[in-house]
Amino acid sequence: MSASMWDWTKRVTPCFCIAATRSSTQGSIQATGNSTFTPTADRRMIDGGEHINIVSYGGGANSTALLIGLHQHRIPVDLILFADTGGEHPHTYAYLDIMDRWLKDHGMPEITRVYKTTKDGRRLTLEDECLKSGTLPSIAYGFKRCSLKHKIGPQEKFCNNYPPCRKVWVSGKKVVKFIGYDAGEHYRSDKVLLRNLADPKYSKWYPLMEWGWDREACIRAIEAAGLPQPGKSSCFFCPSMRAEEIIDLREHYPDLFRRALAMEDNARANLKTVQGLGRNYSWRERFGKEFI
């Protein structure tokens, strides 16, 4: 086990441990200015007992703006998780390093990267899983199992074995989880509201909505913070990619494009309801006939 991993992982059985490639430090936010939004900062002081605030960082504009806003509003953040499928776009991996430097400079914890593992503790990427099973990412078939297994699952297992989270749950309280839905995405929060209220483990908050930050406001906040704009966060073989994004991948990252085509070719014999990564069309037929 890597020396950079949390000490507590030594006490977790291999079949249940989610490895982290970067440790996170606890710390309060150092910031100035007036705060008009305090959904948890006040509650942490009023309720007493154990508390922990976590952010699921996706590497895109909304979750980046969320971290910036939490800092501006002096709302403590104790843990920032990024679930790595192993197939993120290169610009996403590069932005994680940029964001880590910004977080460190602003007294916030660095990003803890987690990923799916097999029962014997080996890492399992989404790409490897698809190649082994001869299938495409489940979103190609209209499902979201790839996100559940490689994004939500690893973060949930990490929290289940993270002592500060366990301590909160043992005390009978909920872990506070900040969600980066912007002010233009009320339809998303409305759909999950009842499920959130019934969640025995997490109290979920939507700060961007309460601040009134829509997509444009998020972009402005990132610019004002002196950060470059993050690119779209997704796997390089995501069936939801638009044609121009696929062409951009082919032109700038031909090796990754070939890997996406190899996944599609590998699954071809098993495809019954879709044509390929484009769902109703094949990436190879439309964009990659000349690629071997």
Language-model regions: role of each:
Residues 1, 19-22, 237:
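Short, cysteine/histidine-rich loop/knuckle motifs that typically chelate Zn2+
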Residues 1-2, 217:
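Conserved short secondary-structure elements within globular domains
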Residues 2-6, 23-26, 244:
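Short, non-ligating residues that shape and space the ligands of small metal-coordination modules
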Residues 3-15:
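Short linker/helix segments within small regulatory modules
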Residues 15-40:
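Short metal-binding segments enriched for Cys and/or His
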Residues 44-292:
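Nucleotide-activated chemistry modules centered on ATP-dependent adenylation/adenylyltransferase
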